[in-house]
Amino acid sequence: MAKMQAKVQADERDDGLREKMISVNRVTKVVKGGRILGFAALTVVGDGDGRIGMGKGKAKEVPVAVQKAMEQARRNMFKVPLKNGTLQHEVHGKHGASAVLLAPAKAGTGVIAGGPMRAVFDVMGVQNVVAKSHGSTNPYNLVRATLDGLRKQSTPADIAAKRGKSVEEILG
């Protein structure tokens, strides 16, 4: 079974969403009469202002698989609270055997992240971040681990509400 990794392709639609294709794999299904070839596509979609979604699509042809993945990514979007083009605080994410460390960075640092994580930050609109992956480098698991970490982000207002204090008391 041959594996085909596509370069990350970017696209911006008329609805203001940024789309990136992370990978396209050739997959096979073995049946009594032989093998049935198909394609699986992994994509991320973001609005450049903190909203992000991931999708996976499978079909007999590449364009159809990519289209299915993009539609699924649009349906699965969620908002991540950003602070001046970076993350609120350091956070860990995990999925399967992939683990990621995501940390905010000073202005001018840029996106220091490898492979699929960079695509996630690009479509999300993060300009400064440092990210490190540990364990498996499977693109699907890395994207899911990155999204897991991003979901764990909390704002000072969230923490203040949980503790029953004001934001000024939390920030000192």
Swiss-Prot record:
GO terms for biological process: translation. Keywords: Ribonucleoprotein, Ribosomal protein, RNA-binding, rRNA-binding. GO terms for molecular function: rRNA binding; structural constituent of ribosome. One of its GO terms (cellular component) is small ribosomal subunit. InterPro entries: Ribosomal_Su5_D2-typ_SF, Ribosomal_uS5, Ribosomal_uS5_bac-type, Ribosomal_uS5_C, Ribosomal_uS5_N, Ribosomal_uS5_N_CS, Ribsml_uS5_D2-typ_fold_subgr. Residues 17-80 form the S5 DRBM domain. The keyword RNA-binding applies. With S4 and S12 plays an important role in translational accuracy. Belongs to the universal ribosomal protein uS5 family. PANTHER family: MITOCHONDRIAL RIBOSOMAL PROTEIN S5. The N-terminal domain interacts with the head of the 30S subunit; the C-terminal domain interacts with the body and contacts protein S4. The interaction surface between S4 and S5 is involved in control of translational fidelity. Part of the 30S ribosomal subunit. Contacts proteins S4 and S8. This is Small ribosomal subunit protein uS5. The gene is rpsE.
